[in-house]
Curated annotation (Swiss-Prot):
It comes from Chlamydia pneumoniae. The active site is at C72 (proton donor), C207 (proton acceptor). The record marks H147, E197 as: Could be important to modulate the pK values of the two catalytic cysteine residues. Pathway: Amino-acid biosynthesis; L-lysine biosynthesis via DAP pathway; DL-2,6-diaminopimelate from LL-2,6-diaminopimelate: step 1/1. It comes from the Bacteria. The gene is dapF. Its main location: cytoplasm. This is Diaminopimelate epimerase. Homodimer. One of its GO terms (cellular component) is cytosol. Its EC number is 5.1.1.7. InterPro entries: DAP_Epimerase, DAP_epimerase_AS, DAP_epimerase_DapF. Pfam families: DAP_epimerase.
């Protein structure tokens, strides 16, 4: 593992997408260095940007444990904000392991990305044995990475250190496992979401693909057509909207100075 002094670490940028924190850089560390850097800076993942022949940049994403997810919605929005500020334009395209995405930088309070996929791969899974208060069935949907969505009357008192790993490693979702979202319906088109993230192996303040998964599952169940507001566990607000068959995720992005 390379030696990282405070001055070396300061060469990276720290971004937050609606509370989801990332280290962003244009040099690629070794996997063990990714784990170290994420631990030192207390972030959820590492974003590596490199030149691309088909987009403004290619984004390679690492979880804090060094694993590589194919997509991270808030990480992608952070990359879009970074590229917009570097290139001096608002229209940004990014190539990822999950495909080519386009986004738009309106302001630091509103960074949008088109998250549309041809197939969301939604499926219902029955849990024969489960701890309370998990329901008999959960929905799994693929929003670039797999997510299980559990709708419950109240989620603020849930112990995600128990319920999260139970579903994340459940044999139903083997061998790769899933991210797990616990969803509370606050009102029409208003959701509160808590997410246990695969690769972080814990709850995060927000999760973009999890917010998207939760909104898609609930809107399909209740027939909602309007934009859905997601109240994250960290207190930020995200919005999922649909227009002419396209699905958009938006929210704030901040950069630590």
């Amino acid at each position: 593992m390379a030696f990282y002094s405070p001055s070396t670490i300061s060469k990276y940028f720290i971004y937050s997408g609606a509370g989801n924190r990332f280290l962003l850089g244009e040099t690629l560390p070794e996997v063990e260095d990714v784990r170290f850097l994420c631990q030192e800076t207390r972030v959820d993942g590492f974003l590596y940007l490199k030149p691309s022949s088909c987009a403004d940049a290619q984004l390679i994403i690492f979880n804090s444990d060094g694993s590589r997810p194919t997509m991270c919605g808030n990480g992608l929005r952070c990359a879009i904000a970074h590229l917009a500020s570097q290139k001096g334009k608002s229209d940004i395209s990014v190539s990822t392991d999950s495909g080519l995405y386009s986004g738009y930088f309106y302001s630091w309070d509103r960074v949008l990305v088109d998250m549309t996929l041809a197939d969301w791969r939604a499926s219902v899974h029955r849990l024969e044995s489960r701890p309370d208060p998990l329901p008999k069935e959960v929905v799994c949907i693929h929003t670039g990475v797999p997510h299980a969505v559990v709708i419950l009357p109240e989620i603020s008192t849930l112990d995600l250190s128990i319920l999260g790993p139970f579903l994340r490693y459940h044999q139903t979702f083997s061998p790769d496992g899933v991210n797990v979202n616990f969803v509370q319906i606050l009102g029409h088109c208003q959701l509160r979401v808590r997410t246990y993230e695969r690769g972080v192996e814990g709850e995060t303040a927000a999760c973009g693909t999890g917010a998207l998964a939760s909104a898609l599952v609930v809107s399909n169940s209740y027939g909602w057509k309007e934009s859905i507001q997601i109240h994250t566990w960290g207190g930020e607000l995200m919005t999922v909207s649909q227009n002419r068959g396209r699905v958009y995720l938006q929210g704030s992005v901040t950069r630590d100075l």
